[in-house]
């Protein structure tokens, strides 16, 4: 199975990429640092540095979108929150546009984001329909 991961060299993405390749998946990582993909994610991972490298005839059964500005490296000022938000929204829109041009559409798109959007709600199970909080 072919899997495309955006943000595959990040905190979550690198662990996921290693796990998937160990299970035999054919993984391609979109990263700002394509030369570092093998070092960070392990051998056998394909690397792209731009969505424009995706061709309409490329086929991926699964696309996992984890890309975005890091959340651990700076205080969350209003300006930083805007960077975090914009980096995720912009890339997601571009990714969906690329998917629309694909001859064979992926069977599954998984798009991750920070749980901070929902705030700390204890042991409550959170879904897309959950009420957001002003924590972020």
What are these regions (language model features)?
Residues 36, 41-94:
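NAD(P)H-binding glycine-rich loop region in Rossmannoid oxidoreductase-like domains
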Residues 15-16, 39, 74-75, 119-122:
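Short glycine-/acidic-enriched loop or helix-start segments at secondary-structure transitions
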Residues 6, 60-66, 110-112:
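Rossmann-fold scaffold of SDR-type NAD(P)-dependent oxidoreductases
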Residues 3-23:
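N-terminal Rossmann NAD(P)H-binding glycine-rich loop of SDR-like oxidoreductase domains
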Residues 18-20, 42-44, 77-80, 123-127:
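Short, glycine/charged-enriched secondary-structure capping and boundary segments
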Residues 93-135:
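Conserved Rossmann-fold NAD(P)-dependent oxidoreductase catalytic core, especially the SDR/UDP-sugar
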Residues 27:
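Short beta-strand element of Class I
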Residues 30-34:
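N-terminal Rossmann-fold cofactor-binding loop
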């Amino acid at each position: 199975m072919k899997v495309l991961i955006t943000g595959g060299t990040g905190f979550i993405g690198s662990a996921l990429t290693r796990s998937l390749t160990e299970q035999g998946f054919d993984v391609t990582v979109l990263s700002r640092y394509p030369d570092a993909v093998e070092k960070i994610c392990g051998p056998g991972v394909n690397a792209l540095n731009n969505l424009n490298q995706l061709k309409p005839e490329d086929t991926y059964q699964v696309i996992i979108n984890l890309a975005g500005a890091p959340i651990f490296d700076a205080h969350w000022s209003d300006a930083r929150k805007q960077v975090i938000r914009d980096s995720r929204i912009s890339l997601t829109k571009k990714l969906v546009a690329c998917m629309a041009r694909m001859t064979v559409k992926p069977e599954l798109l998984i798009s991750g984001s920070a749980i901070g959007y929902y705030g700390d709600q204890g042991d409550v199970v959170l879904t897309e329909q959950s009420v957001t909080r002003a924590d972020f």
